[in-house]
Amino acid sequence: MGGEQEEERFDGMLLAMAQQHEGGVQELVNTFFSFLRRKTDFFIGGEEGMAEKLITQTFSHHNQLAQKTRREKRARQEAERREKAERAARLAKEAKSETSGPQIKELTDEEAERLQLEIDQKKDAENHEAQLKNGSLDSPGKQDTEEDEEEDEKDKGKLKPNLGNGADLPNYRWTQTLSELDLAVPFCVNFRLKGKDMVVDIQRRHLRVGLKGQPAIIDGELYNEVKVEESSWLIEDGKVVTVHLEKINKMEWWSRLVSSDPEINTKKINPENSKLSDLDSETRSMVEKMMYDQRQKSMGLPTSDEQKKQEILKKFMDQHPEMDFSKAKFN
């Protein structure tokens, strides 16, 4: 039978026809067979039973395709569910270890590398400060430092993101990627939590988490809208409630979970921790461009758009050597 493009050839016409059948698929099928009966010799033109055989074969073919599609969809959903459960369990384990007091923690290679980078940056900052006191740095360096301090003035007081690009707060911990957010809320109770003990209400722009009969741990307006039907929550180890939220806008970092939370400095977020591989190619290229432009701006270098303009200008100047651009001003 025909390929996908051939199958979709009459979709517009059939969809318009289907929308005029208030009785649904049954009425649409009846109209189709009525057309075959009245306008063709489908039922009487061939041998006995040929029409019925053709209908049965066609139904069997498309039924197999439909069942295959449904199985593949279920497999994808199950894989996503397992991934979310594993992520929630990992988050709950981290939250539980943090509430159980100081412990020796073995760092992963990535965490160790990031920690070493922070130590090196701190040493560089100390050396820089010492050089400033000794007067060994020239005035342009001092001017750059003052400009950086002025630029970051509005970010003073904001929290530094945790390793998951979220925040570690007194009563809960949250992490995020561009497309989703995970939250772990540990409860200090002397019994194993069950679903009936909890009040978890996920709405498009509001979240509430707490114990029944107790003041809610979280009860506020979310930073932005979430897909309620794709969000979920569960209880880990009988002590920690984990919540998974799917963002509607997958092109932004949240600076807080709910409006009552302190803000994190989204400029210090590490984009590499997010799952760019989960995004479609178009969205991924846009995000990578945003990340590149952000890095360029932080270093005082031209963005990708500015680089393109410079290349076009340079090409034009090369093609017109007779023109004098020395006194020209470019924006």
From Swiss-Prot:
The modification N6-acetyllysine is found at K239. Its main location: cytoplasm. One of its GO terms (biological process) is mitotic metaphase chromosome alignment. A motif (Nuclear localization signal) lies at residues 68-74. Gene3D superfamilies: 2.60.40.790. Residues 75-97 have a biased composition (Basic and acidic residues). It is found in: Cytoplasm, Cytoskeleton; Nucleus; Cytoplasm, Cytoskeleton, Spindle; Midbody. Changing S326A: Abolishes phosphorylation by PLK1. The modification Phosphoserine is found at S60, S136, S139, S259, S260, S274, S277, S285, S298, S326. Residues 167-258 form the CS domain. Ubiquitous. Highly expressed in fetal liver, kidney, lung and brain. Highly expressed in adult pancreas, kidney, skeletal muscle, liver, lung, placenta, prostate, brain and heart. Residues 62-108, 129-170 are annotated as: Disordered. Reversibly phosphorylated on serine residues during the M phase of the cell cycle. Phosphorylation on Ser-274 and Ser-326 is necessary for correct formation of mitotic spindles and chromosome separation during mitosis. Phosphorylated by PLK and other kinases. GO terms for molecular function: cadherin binding; unfolded protein binding. One of its GO terms (cellular component) is mitotic spindle. Residues 60-134 form a coiled coil. Keywords: Acetylation, Cell cycle, Cell division, Coiled coil, Cytoplasm, Cytoskeleton, Microtubule, Mitosis, Nucleus, Phosphoprotein. Induction: Up-regulated in actively dividing hematopoietic precursor cells. Up-regulated in cultured erythroleukemia TF-1 cells by granulocyte-macrophage colony-stimulating factor. Strongly down-regulated during maturation of erythroid precursor cells. The modification Phosphothreonine is found at T108, T145. PROSITE patterns: CS. Residues 173-331 are annotated as: Interaction with EML4. Belongs to the nudC family. Interacts with PAFAH1B1. Interacts with PLK1. Part of a complex containing PLK1, NUDC, dynein and dynactin. Interacts with DCDC1. Interacts with EML4 (via WD repeats). Plays a role in neurogenesis and neuronal migration. Necessary for correct formation of mitotic spindles and chromosome separation during mitosis. Necessary for cytokinesis and cell proliferation. This is Nuclear migration protein nudC. It comes from Homo sapiens. The gene is NUDC.
